[in-house]
Every structure is written in structure tokens, then in C-alpha cells.
Amino acid sequence: MSKHVAVLMGGWSSEREISLRSGNACAAALEGEGYRVTRVDVGPDIATVLTELRPDAALNALHGPAGEDGTIQGLLEILKIPYTHSGVLASALAMHKERAKTVMRAAGVSVPEGRVVNRHDAAKSHPLTPPYVVKPIAEGSSMGVIIVRDERSHPPQILASDEWVYGEEVLAETYVAGRELTCAVLGDRALGVTEIKPVSGEWYDFDAKYAGGGSIHVLPADLKLNIYQRVQELALTAHQALGCRGVSRADLRYDDTPGGTGALVVLEVNTQPGMTQTSLVPEIAAHAGQSFGELVRWMVEDASLNR
């Protein structure tokens, strides 16, 4: 009898629609691999739903709070349902950008300088010397990210408005010029490195990530061999330092601009990367010789408790 997999998707975070895309793509691929699949749009009754379903494993395709911060992982541990991706601690740690940076820095991974500030204070005066980036402490998909370019710019006033829905504290970081890189990690190996070139603008914002034609993916990234290998080393070290399991994706910046610093820094580790067939991790896996079906099969067969 084929293994029964519950694909968890949707939820109630700001990344709901992205999660539905990931979940439906994974579900279709698993069906193609011969699994019995139940698509679960996660709501407040998720404990009851899973108790009644009793799947053999859960593929976690949720994004954002509750889905990648240790919450759903803790529930799955309580219900004794093996699951994919990282466990409770690694998920919670990676989701909190500042605490994740502290752990990565201790492991020798270069990260941008920065500090946590109250959003109202950041709206009154520059928390760092521009250029700098302000971002929510615990959001994905570049939600709420603001770049302040020079001293003449006013501090971002949206931080003090009712439109800001990403928490009272924000992370201000030194802006690192240069190239946007990402590296997929699968288990104990780094699969490959992609350079992301936004079609409009100079950084990989929400529209560049999810709008059709919003970015160009250069795979493998056109880097000197030593830099390419260093990106992979940093991604794998960050994955291991945070205690990640299964699939993760590290996002980095590399300043190779004329007269630049040459800095290569890890911005964050995403424990629940996008999982449509055209998402970054499946693209990198395909380039490494692993089809989308093979990738999701590996993820389900890797599922366990106590992650």
C-alpha cells in the first residue's frame, strides 16, 4: 500500500498564496511518484484534521509565521506524525533573523552588521548610517523590506504607521552592494548556487520573486571557482549551525562592485523555501540532476520526528 502523505499548505500568514502554490505543486509531484496524497489547507482546526487523517508523513509546504517558526512542527511532534524540513528549534531560530545571525556569526559565517530597534524609533531617526536595510524580524518573501540609500532620505515613515503589520521591533542592517546569490542545501550537501538578477530594481523584492519575468536566474552563478565554493561552504555551515534538516536555502550578497569591499555575507537561511517547479531550490536540484518528483520523494522519505 502506498504511503499516505498530508501536504500542509495555505494557512493564514501573509505568504498564504505562495504556500498554496508550493503545496499544490508538491502534491501533484507526489501523486506522480505514486503516493496517496491529501491536500490540507491549514486552519485553526488543524490538530483535529490531522488526528482524523493519521497520515504516514506530512510534507510541510507552509510559509511564514505558524508554518516555519516551530509552531506546526511542535504540533506534528505531539501528534507523532513524521514531517519534512527542519524541526522545532531550527525553525524558530532561523525565522528570527537577529538570533539566527548570532548563531551563524558564532559558527564563523559572515553576516551583515546591524541591530534591532523599535519601529517608531527607526521612523524618527536613522538607526544606522545609510545605506541600510530595514526588515521585519520574522517574515519571509521580502515582506516589509525597505532600503534607505543616503543621509538625505527621510527615515521610512511607514514604520510608524498603522500600515506596518510586521511587529514592533525591526532589524536594521548595513546594506551590502553587489550580487544576489542563493544556495540550496539538501541534507548534508550544498547542491549549487544561483545568481538572481531582478529585471527592474536592484534587489530581489516580492514582485521580483513571484511576478512572471520579475527576475533572471543564472544557474550556475558566474563566479570564480573559489567564490562559488565559498558560497556553498557558507550555506552548508549556516544550515548545520542552525540545526536545519532536509531542504534549506541560504540567501547571500556578494560585493564585487568596482572599489567594493569584496564582502560575501549570508542574509538569512530559509527553512521553508518555495517549492513550485520553477522555484529556486527545485531549479538548482534539477541542474544537479534531480527531477522535481525525485526531490519531493527524497523529502518525504527523509521525514521523521525529533528533527
Curated annotation (Swiss-Prot):
Residues bound to Mg(2+) 2: 268, 270
Subcellular localization, as worded in the UniProt entry: Cytoplasm
Binding site for Mg(2+) 1: 251, 268
GO function terms (MF aspect): ATP binding; D-alanine-D-alanine ligase activity; metal ion binding
Cited SUPFAM superfamilies: Glutathione synthetase ATP-binding domain-like, PreATP-grasp domain
Cofactor(s) needed: Mg(2+); Mn(2+)
Pathway(s) per entry: Cell wall biogenesis; peptidoglycan biosynthesis
Tagged with keyword Transport: no
InterPro entries documented for this protein: ATP-grasp, ATP_grasp_subdomain_1, D-Ala_lig_Van_CS, D_ala_D_ala, Dala_Dala_lig_C, Dala_Dala_lig_N, PreATP-grasp_dom_sf
Signal peptide (from-to): none
Matching Gene3D superfamilies: 3.40.50.20, ATP-grasp fold, A domain, ATP-grasp fold, B domain
PROSITE patterns found in the cross-reference section: ATP_GRASP, DALA_DALA_LIGASE_1, DALA_DALA_LIGASE_2
Record: residues binding ATP: 127-182
UniProt cofactor note: Binds 2 magnesium or manganese ions per subunit.
EC number: 6.3.2.4
Protein family membership: Belongs to the D-alanine--D-alanine ligase family.
HAMAP family in alphabetical order: Dala_Dala_lig
Known function: Cell wall formation.
Name by which UniProt lists this protein: D-alanine--D-alanine ligase
Organism: Methylorubrum extorquens (strain CM4 / NCIMB 13688)
Gene this protein is translated from: ddl
